[in-house]
UniProtKB/Swiss-Prot annotation:
GO cellular component: host cell cytoplasm; T=13 icosahedral viral capsid
Keywords: Capsid protein, Host cytoplasm, Hydrolase, Metal-binding, Protease, Serine protease, T=13 icosahedral capsid protein, Virion
Residues where a divalent metal cation binds: 30
Species annotation: Avian infectious bursal disease virus (strain Chicken/Cuba/Soroa/1998)
Comp. bias regions, Basic residues: 975-986
The protein, known as: Structural polyprotein
Cleavage, annotated site positions: 441-442, 487-488, 494-495, 501-502, 512-513, 755-756
GO molecular function term, any single one: serine-type peptidase activity
Active-site residues, Swiss-Prot/TrEMBL: 652 (nucleophile), 692
Length: 1012
């Protein structure tokens, strides 16, 4: 949608940059077409906390320039004192003439402690005020929260260690470029002369009626009598000018006036002083004119200006004590703030106040500002600029999303941890083809679907060549989500009359419920077609419904990759894993934009696209290859992924590339391969096998390579890869439940693999992991230390324990706690927990809890069968029983939830019984019990299959019955007397330790001995 020449584009870069500025700048897709360059500018400040431990940071989140904000510290007298301005790292006016702000985010938090302080304390309040800074009436720590009633624009009592993030959201669109106040060529007699070109469009003008026949009267005093003629609130952080005039009349001879204008900052101090008149003598009986014509350049405004004041000093030539002085005045002034009314320049403002932070601590402000910039003539000689791309669909989509930001949970101020967690949701919003899985969890899915339906057709309206793409996307939405999307947009939900069940796309929807797939329920059908009651659709499949080239029928080999994403200096790393496919040729059109243009050369000089250009791949290949991320694999097709995956590093994909180069399969090989090859062609072990194992098993694939469950690797890769079969996965097989090739104890191993946390593999990190493993094997104390670390990470208290260690450097408190802690098996422990052991209550569930668990189990079982009305509450009302056949038939025919305890016998029809032949039963039993060529199944198993056919009136087993038969077959195989006896396992010398629920990121989750 955002690139009319590239129909594979899914991301709207502008809204992605708005919601996640750390992803970089993007051109604003409006109709302001000027050649520009994109630039991302950082801002980093370490602010020292004052004596009171409190302070205030004022941000101008929408200001189109280098100014970011200002910092104030709270003094002992209750007033704020200006500390410093916050700017971007580069002074933009020095190199650029014009600017447009694209996006901006700033993070405020503290992670340092001054000397003598052992705990990080203090809290933060933050609020976004839709007015200007001078309009705030209460800037105290608690008073800030009353500045707005919008809950999405304020947060309170956030720990200073967690921090807050300020997100700039636009208040207007289709804006022009702003002149930055850049210096212009000029020559003057004064070497300090400076000439700049400031922004003159959209000025903010304050008109002040200074006096309307104001009467002044006083007695003479030495030095004159000073009065404040007026004081008014204004807002300025850029250049300003003051114009106007005052007219004075007097009847006293020898009066002398002086006038001074003061520009006052937010903290009440005078920033700029200008003498307008000095020793002006007044003539009696006439109008005495005092003109005002001031220009204040930007470089003299060193802090935000919030008010202006005019003082008049009255004196008398040759005056004596007691002489009368009087005059009257009238007139007006106009204060013009250049560019002050540009949206975002002076309003809104975001205020972040911190309190009770240790004196001397450092509060860090870090963030990024993204701009569209037009360089000055000198820089333009060496900097390439280009036009922005006009995309009405992307612009309309962005406007519609942000117009509903309150309903969609898009805030301007966030706790930093919450903002980091929301990044995946923001990526869903920016991706037009995303299935909105996270948005559905928050209840935002219908809103975004309706917005997509409105925004996407704009492309086909304005650009006819893009109509097929918009039509295909719209049809995909109507096909899978039409009823719910229409309901969200105001259209009544009703049967659409489309025979959706007859479509071949239903075949792409798997019943893999354990992957947490979302439910696309109640797809209405016409009477002559089968009814599809709630298909469980995977995110990849939903993405495929909108994407035109998501399914690729081509030979490929697969390998898993462990990757990390690094956001910025203030954001931690986040782990992710992905399956990749190796396909032949240069196919960058199938890659996501984040991977295109990156490749690595092999030893033979060929290229492998999708790898980071880091050295040479230690392989000799006969052709070029491309690696692409995938979401799923079915039979002879792979489903491509358009997730923003970075280029690959490391050597764990060498085995898959080598297999592809030698055998050149015509269909995807349904085995995930992992393994690095050395110069001798031998397979070397790779790290992070547990995470790769989880990635493979999410797709129902085996993991082949060093350390896999069931593949014995030889020393030479050519011998190893010949063992790979072509074993397509059945359509109705669950991804990783009861897989026949898993050993009986694989469930625990897989659980550990799923819970593991790893990092991107690099040679340095692999060496460090091996060194830690070797040290743990020879040093029991080090092994115990690693166990403690794993326990801390498993329970999420690593940071808490680190802070506790700072407050207890000699471990006195910890020793006392451990000495007094109840031991396992002690009297107090048995009295509290029974005999179940330390920390586990020895009691069963109450009858009510057991009944609720039973209702939940029945409901989940019904859900796997497509019966979604049987919620736990409905099952409880139905006498804690599942739905009867009559209730199910009533729901299928009427589309209404049946009443509990009503059998609906009128809807039950007796089924015709038909008998299955012995040959049919034997063939089915042989197919289920083992592969062709093996011994025939025992008679007991044939009898079990015959019972199933009898129960089903001559039909074959359903999913649940097939699962039970597979389990029965596995049990009978283990009891087969002809089966070789397993080798006896040696008894351990030491008692086995309780395995942790989740291992640490530095320890391999599955050892080689466990995998044999």
């Amino acid at each position: 949608m955002t690139n009319l020449s590239d129909q594979t584009q899914q991301i709207v870069p502008f809204i992605r940059s708005l919601l996640m500025p750390t992803t970089g700048p993007a051109s604003i897709p409006d109709d302001t077409l000027e050649k520009h360059t994109l630039r991302s500018e950082t801002s980093t400040y370490n602010l020292t906390v004052g004596d009171t431990g409190s302070g205030l940071i004022v941000f101008f989140p929408g200001f189109p320039g280098s100014i970011v904000g200002a910092h104030y510290t709270l003094q002992g007298n209750g007033n704020y004192k200006f500390d410093q301005m916050l700017l971007t790292a580069q002074n933009l006016p020095a190199s650029y003439n014009y600017c447009r702000l694209v996006s901006r985010s700033l993070t405020v938090r503290s992670s340092t402690l001054p000397g003598g302080v052992y705990a990080l304390n203090g809290t933060i309040n933050a609020v976004t005020f839709q007015g200007s800074l001078s309009e705030l009436t209460d800037v105290s720590y608690n008073g800030l929260m009353s500045a707005t009633a919008n809950i999405n624009d304020k947060i309170g009592n956030v720990l200073v260690g967690e921090g807050v993030t300020v997100l700039s959201l636009p208040t207007s669109y289709d804006l022009g470029y702003v002149r930055l106040g850049d210096p212009i060529p000029a020559i003057g007699l004064d070497p300090k002369m400076v000439a700049t070109c400031d922004s003159s469009d959209r000025p903010r003008v304050y008109t002040i009626t200074a006096a309307d026949d104001y009467q002044f009267s006083s007695q003479y005093q030495p030095g004159g009598v000073t009065i404040t003629l007026f004081s008014a609130n204004i807002d300025a952080i850029t250049s300003l000018s003051v114009g106007g005039e005052l007219v004075f009349r007097t009847s006293v001879h020898g009066l002398v006036l002086g006038a001074t204008i003061y520009l006052i900052g937010f903290d009440g101090t005078t920033v700029i002083t200008r003498a307008v008149a000095a020793n002006n003598g007044l003539t009696t009986g006439t109008d005495n004119l005092m003109p005002f014509n001031l220009v204040i350049p930007t470089n003299e405004i060193t802090q935000p200006i919030t008010s202006i004041k005019l003082e008049i000093v009255t004196s008398k030539s040759g005056g004596q004590a007691g002489d009368q002085m009087s005059w009257s005045a009238r007139g007006s002034l106009a204060v013009t703030i250049h560019g002050g009314n540009y949206p975002g320049a002076l309003r809104p403002v975001t205020l972040v106040a911190y309190e009770r932070v240790a004196t001397g601590s450092v509060v860090t402000v870090a963030g990024v500002s993204n701009f569209e910039l037009i360089p000055n003539p000198e820089l333009a000689k060496n900097l390439v600029t280009e036009y922005g791309r006009f995309d009405p669909g992307a612009m309309n989509y962005t406007k519609l999303i942000l117009s509903e930001r309150d309903r969609l949970g898009i805030k301007t101020v966030w706790p930093t941890r919450e903002y980091t967690d929301f990044r995946e949701y923001f990526m869903e919003v920016a991706d037009l083809n995303s299935p909105l899985k996270i948005a559905g969890a928050f209840g935002f899915k219908d809103i975004i679907r309706a917005i997509r339906r409105i925004a996407v057709p704009v492309v086909s309206t304005l650009f006819p060549p893009a109509a097929p793409l918009a039509h295909a996307i719209g049809e995909g939405v109507d096909y899978l989500l039409g009823d719910e999307a229409q309901a969200a947009s105001g259209t009544a939900r009703a049967a659409s009359g489309k025979a959706r069940a007859a479509s071949g796309r239903i075949r792409q929807l798997t019943l893999a419920a354990d992957k947490g797939y979302e439910v696309v329920a109640n797809l209405f059908q016409v009477p002559q077609n089968p009814v599809v009651d709630g298909i469980l659709a995977s995110p990849g499949v939903l993405r495929g419904a909108h994407n035109l080239d998501c399914v690729l029928r081509e030979g490929a080999t697969l390998f898993p990759v462990v990757i990390t994403t690094v956001e910025d200096a203030m954001t931690p790393k986040a782990l992710n894993s992905k399956m990749f496919a190796v396909i032949e040729g240069v196919r960058e059109d199938l890659q996501p934009p984040s991977q295109r243009g990156s490749f690595i050369r092999t030893l033979s000089g060929h290229r492998v696209y999708g790898y980071a250009p880091d050295g040479v791949l230690p392989l000799e290949t006969g052709r070029d290859y491309t690696v692409v991320p995938i979401d799923d694999v079915w039979d002879d097709s792979i489903m491509l992924s358009k997730d923003p995956i970075p280029p690959i590093v490391g050597n764990s994909g060498n085995l898959a590339i080598a297999y592809m180069d030698v055998f050149r399969p015509k269909v995807p090989i349904h085995v995930a391969m992992t393994g690095a090859l050395n110069a001798c062609g031998e397979i070397e072990k790779v790290s992070f096998r547990s995470t790769k194992l989880a990635t493979a098993h999410r797709l129902g694939l085996r993991l082949a390579g060093p350390g896999a469950f069931d593949v014995n690797t030889g020393p030479n890769w050519a011998t190893f890869i010949k063992r790979f079969p072509h074993n397509p996965r059945d359509w109705d097989r669950l991804p990783y439940l009861n897989l026949p090739y898993l050993p009986p104890n694989a469930g625990r191993q897989y659980h550990l693999a799923m819970a593991a946390s790893e990092f991107k593999e690099t040679p340095e990190l692999e060496s460090a992991v091996r060194a830690m493993e070797a040290a743990a094997n020879v040093d029991p104390l080090f092994q115990s230390a690693l166990s403690v670390f794993m326990w801390l990470e498993e329970n999420g208290i690593v940071t808490d324990m680190a802070n506790f260690a700072l407050s207890d450097p000699n471990a006195h408190r910890m020793r006392n706690f451990l000495a007094n802690a109840p031991q396992a098996g002690s009297k107090s422990q048995r009295a509290k927990y029974g005999t179940a052991g330390y920390g586990v209550e020895a009691r069963g569930p109450t009858p009510e809890e057991a009944q609720r668990e039973k209702d939940t189990r029945i409901s989940k079982k019904m859900e796997t069968m497509g019966i979604y009305f049987a919620t736990p509450e409905w099952v409880a009302l139905n006498g804690h029983r599942g739905p009867s056949p009559g209730q199910v038939k009533y729901w299928q025919n009427k589309r209404e939830i049946p009443d509990p305890n009503e059998d609906y016998l009128d809807y039950v029809h007796a089924e015709k019984s038909r008998l299955a032949s012995e040959e049919q039963i034997l063939r089915a039993a042989t197919s289920i019990y083992g592969a062709p060529g093996q011994a025939e199944p025992p008679q007991a198993f044939i009898d079990e299959v015959a019972k199933v056919y009898e129960i089903n009136h001559g039909r074959g087993p359903n999913q649940e019955q097939m699962k039970d038969l597979l389990l029965t077959a596995m049990e009978m195989k283990h009891r087969n007397p002809r089966r070789a006896l397993p080798k006896p396992k040696p008894k351990p010398n030491a008692p086995t330790q309780r395995p942790p629920g989740r291992l640490g990121r530095w320890i391999r989750t599955v050892s080689d001995e466990d995998l044999e």
